[in-house]
């Protein structure tokens, strides 16, 4: 329950040199242009793609310097609206007391709303308990999931007519500080997390309803490695590293038990995207290898028996990359280079193709 103390030993706020950024921080607007979002200088900044393919920025958003920690979680709905969630120390509070803050960008390149507090699952001033994950349901309502002080999961959801519901305690204990939220093909939200003893999923069965916790599935999981994607069936597949260092897939709605796919390239989180190449659906997985360089592996979507091979290493990066399709369906990847600046690359042709030359935005 949320009133018990179970704070994780490691704080994943990020640092000025290595920001913590999660979710859809590479976004595509209704006009097809891309945006990149990162935490910087106590706030959040944005780079925006122009009509000619060039980039402008960085530009402060959400009211400029808002005293934020270097952590940013991003979600985007089908309406193109980008929801940003940061962590902010509580003014006058004790050290390590934080609240979650939210902003929305409605249109590519346009100003975002001022940061507004959505408090914390345990109250207005509670210590860091986990890094939020954001997803947007089928009718445009944002859901902000966060590990709470009892080690379970809480969520705060937007109302239809504006404003927010109170924090809902979804129960659980000893969950991963880095949960992964995703919206399925029915427009309902799901939350995937790991536990010391296995895997756990929270599922929304009706529009706007509180997600429900399912039974723990025993499995050897490495915390902090999970990613998830909606596939061509509309069902979600979660990916994670097991304790033998293998990338595994799990899709409850498809009846897919935890299935090893390939030896992991490194130890950190996975990023996953669904893409279509010549009419064939593929799942692309990205990870930092043991040397800190980004690598990719692809297989036909929802065919977990297919062979996977990691690509040749790309540039050295900080943290996992972001992946998405551009307006023409081509693959785009974004990452934070070793020096702290964002870099992007476009995919090449073919189902096994990976992003090509990387360039600074």
PLM regions and their residue ranges:
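A structural motif
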Residues: 1-361
């Amino acid at each position: 329950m949320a009133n018990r103390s179970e704070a994780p030993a490691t704080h994943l706020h990020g640092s000025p040199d290595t920001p913590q950024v999660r979710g859809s921080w590479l976004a595509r607007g209704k006009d097809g242009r891309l945006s990149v979002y990162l935490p910087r200088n106590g706030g959040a900044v944005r780079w925006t793609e122009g009509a000619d393919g060039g980039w402008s920025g960085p530009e402060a958003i959400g009211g400029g310097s808002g005293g934020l920690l270097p952590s940013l979680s991003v979600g985007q709905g089908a309406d193109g609206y980008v929801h940003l969630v940061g962590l902010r120390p509580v003014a006058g509070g004790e050290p390590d007391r934080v609240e979650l803050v939210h902003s929305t960008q409605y249109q590519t390149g346009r100003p975002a709303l001022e940061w507004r507090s959505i408090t914390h699952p345990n109250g207005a001033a509670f210590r860091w308990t986990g890094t939020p994950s954001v997803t947007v349901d089928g009718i445009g309502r944002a859901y902000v999931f966060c590990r709470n002080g009892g080690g379970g999961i809480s969520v705060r959801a937007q109302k239809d007519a504006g404003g927010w519901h109170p924090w809902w305690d979804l129960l659980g204990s000893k969950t991963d500080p880095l949960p992964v939220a995703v919206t399925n093909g029915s427009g309902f939200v799901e939350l995937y997390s790991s536990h010391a003893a296995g895997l756990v999923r929270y599922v929304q069965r009706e529009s706007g309803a509180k997600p429900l916790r399912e039974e723990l599935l025993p499995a050897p999981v490495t915390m902090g490695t999970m990613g998830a994607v909606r596939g061509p069936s509309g069902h979600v597949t979660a990916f994670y590293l097991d304790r033998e260092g293998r990338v595994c897939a799990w899709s409850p709605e498809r009846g897919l038990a935890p299935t090893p796919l390939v030896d992991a390239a490194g130890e950190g989180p996975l990023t996953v995207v669904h893409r279509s190449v010549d009419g064939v659906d593929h799942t692309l997985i990205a990870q930092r290898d043991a040397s800190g360089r980004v690598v990719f592996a692809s297989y036909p979507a929802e065919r977990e028996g297919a062979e996977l091979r990691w690509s040749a290493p790309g540039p050295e990066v900080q943290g996992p990359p972001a992946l998405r399709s551009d307006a023409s369906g081509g693959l785009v990847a974004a990452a934070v280079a070793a020096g702290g600046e964002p870099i992007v690359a476009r995919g090449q042709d073919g189902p096994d193709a990976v992003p090509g030359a990387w360039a600074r935005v």
